[in-house]
Amino acid sequence: MPARADVRLAPRQRLTRGLKYTAVGPVDITRGVLGIGADTAQATAAELRRRYASGKLQRQLAAAAEAVAALPETIQEAVQEVVSPPKKRRRRPLLIAAVAVTVLGGGAAAFSIVRRRSRPQEPPTLAPSVEVAPKP
């Protein structure tokens, strides 16, 4: 009896046929055992995926329940922040402004001193209106 290639057999049917016929038996037995092993592995993987999804769902439900349990405390904290916001200290901007004023003041003083020293002292071109040495 020739084996028909167009018929798709399930792994169990293939194993049964392989045990029944001796001509194509070893090939069908091997393919049947491998097919059963593959089906088992696929079923195991599907079960593991289902368990993982179920565990993930349980973890998500537990996290949601915890969030709902903490909701009154969170609302109370939010209301307190809105009613009386915490006072923040503004030390850094004041410090930066003070340093900027000091640097500008120091720069102005240095500019003034350097400018005075760089100008030569020329005698005035007009005669003095008052005599420098009084007569006795």
UniProtKB/Swiss-Prot annotation:
The keyword Nucleus does not apply. The keyword Repeat does not apply. Coiled coil: none annotated. The chain crosses the membrane at residues 94-114. It is a single-pass membrane protein. Interacts with CrgA and Wag31. Required for regulated cell division, cell wall synthesis and the maintenance of cell shape. Belongs to the CwsA family. This is Cell wall synthesis protein CwsA. It comes from Mycolicibacterium smegmatis (strain ATCC 700084 / mc(2)155) (Mycobacterium smegmatis). The gene is cwsA.
